């Protein structure tokens, strides 16, 4: 069975990445593209300012765009690439109308009854769906994926939790595509690093606590760890690089950490990579140009794992921010829900 799917916010950068990844998906058939009022009724291929790689997929070219209204969208699942302020208004309307909303937006990530999910990290948090539907009286529901920087970070932290992880410090070097299009002005970022991204550090410090927490049948009990973040925009197109310092409640060797990273098992899902975490031994890896497309953009790459004091380690982690960190994350969540027979 193939499920009909739609994209909310279809013309933006993440919306385009959704369309690119859904075009030949074995489980999903792209049927609806929703956009702003000025684009309604126009064919996607004629109206979109296509900025991701390759051409507009044939399946999307002749689809007439519709309003962001449940009455006009013909789909079983909608993927939301909306800005947070618009998502806060639009997504509940779709959930109330019975749609499955797989959202990349930040609007409902930290809501108590909304699952914030990375399939390899906390699939059991999907149990919140029934809590959400009961609380809100909806026929459908919203499931979210984290911020792009958070996803890359937490995929690397999950295997370390069993080693007694207590404290995390992270400095991100975030790609320009994370700011959308047209994004950061060229004169602001050329020959420069911008040491501030509005709202980003709060997300990176808060979201991991929910993701790594426990579902008790009613709500998420947040993880008992501390995360401190400093986020920076750098002149790279795609691929977020993060320098991470971690402390444990005991001494942990580099070899233990490597084994833990490599133990994170992939899922038997269409968008899942063969290896979730790739560990590089070279002293100068990972790098965005060399490693962002690993696993078709769905793997993360860890390198430069070193001791840092008696109970600490430090390492570099990199992931593709618009694939694993955005569209691919929502698609993987939808695949997981199908596998678990939630959809």
From Swiss-Prot:
UniProt xrefs under SMART domains: Semialdhyde_dh
Catalytic activity: L-aspartate 4-semialdehyde + phosphate + NADP(+) = 4-phospho-L-aspartate + NADPH + H(+)
Domain of life, source organism: Archaea
Positions of the catalytic residues: 148 (acyl-thioester intermediate), 240 (proton acceptor)
Keyword Amino-acid biosynthesis: yes
Pathway where it operates: Amino-acid biosynthesis; L-lysine biosynthesis via DAP pathway; (S)-tetrahydrodipicolinate from L-aspartate: step 2/4; Amino-acid biosynthesis; L-methionine biosynthesis via de novo pathway; L-homoserine from L-aspartate: step 2/3; Amino-acid biosynthesis; L-threonine biosynthesis; L-threonine from L-aspartate: step 2/5
Residues that, per the record, bind substrate: 174, 200, 233
Residues involved in phosphate binding: 109, 203
One Gene Ontology term of the molecular function aspect: aspartate-semialdehyde dehydrogenase activity
HAMAP family according to UniProt: ASADH
Family affiliation: Belongs to the aspartate-semialdehyde dehydrogenase family.
Record's protein name: Aspartate-semialdehyde dehydrogenase
Name of the gene encoding the protein in the UniProt record: asd
């Amino acid at each position: 069975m193939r499920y009909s799917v739609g994209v909310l916010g279809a013309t933006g950068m993440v919306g385009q990445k959704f369309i690119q990844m859904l075009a030949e998906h074995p489980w999903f058939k792209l049927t609806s593209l929703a956009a702003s009022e000025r684009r309604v009724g126009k064919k996607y291929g004629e109206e979109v300012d296509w900025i991701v790689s390759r051409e507009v997929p044939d399946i999307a070219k002749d689809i007439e765009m519709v309003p962001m209204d449940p009455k006009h969208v013909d789909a079983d699942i909608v993927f939301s690439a909306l800005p947070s302020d618009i998502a806060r208004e639009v997504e509940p309307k779709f959930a109330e109308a019975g749609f499955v909303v797989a959202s990349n937006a930040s609007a409902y990530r930290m809501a108590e009854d909304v699952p914030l999910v990375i399939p390899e990290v906390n699939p059991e948090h999907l149990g919140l769906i029934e809590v959400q539907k009961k609380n809100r009286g909806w026929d459908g529901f919203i499931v979210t994926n984290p911020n792009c920087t958070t996803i890359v970070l937490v995929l690397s932290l999950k295997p370390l939790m069993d080693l007694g992880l207590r404290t995390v410090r992270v400095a991100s070097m975030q790609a320009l595509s994370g700011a959308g299009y047209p994004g950061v002005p060229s004169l602001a970022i050329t020959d420069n690093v911008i040491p501030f991204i509005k709202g980003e550090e709060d997300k990176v410090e808060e979201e991991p606590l929910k993701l790594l927490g426990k579902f008790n049948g009613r709500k998420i009990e947040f993880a008992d760890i501390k995360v401190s973040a400093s986020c920076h925009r750098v002149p790279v197109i795609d691929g977020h690089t993060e320098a991470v310092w971690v402390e444990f409640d005991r001494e942990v060797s580099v070899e233990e950490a490597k084994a833990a990273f490599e133990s994170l098992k992939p899922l038997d899902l269409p968008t899942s990579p063969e290896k979730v975490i790739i560990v590089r031994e070279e002293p100068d890896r990972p790098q965005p140009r060399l490693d962002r497309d690993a696993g078709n953009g769905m793997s993360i790459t860890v390198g430069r794992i070193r001791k840092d004091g008696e109970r600490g380690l430090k390492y570099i982690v990199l992931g593709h921010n618009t694939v694993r960190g955005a569209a691919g994350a929502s698609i993987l969540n939808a695949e997981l829900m199908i596998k678990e027979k939630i959809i």
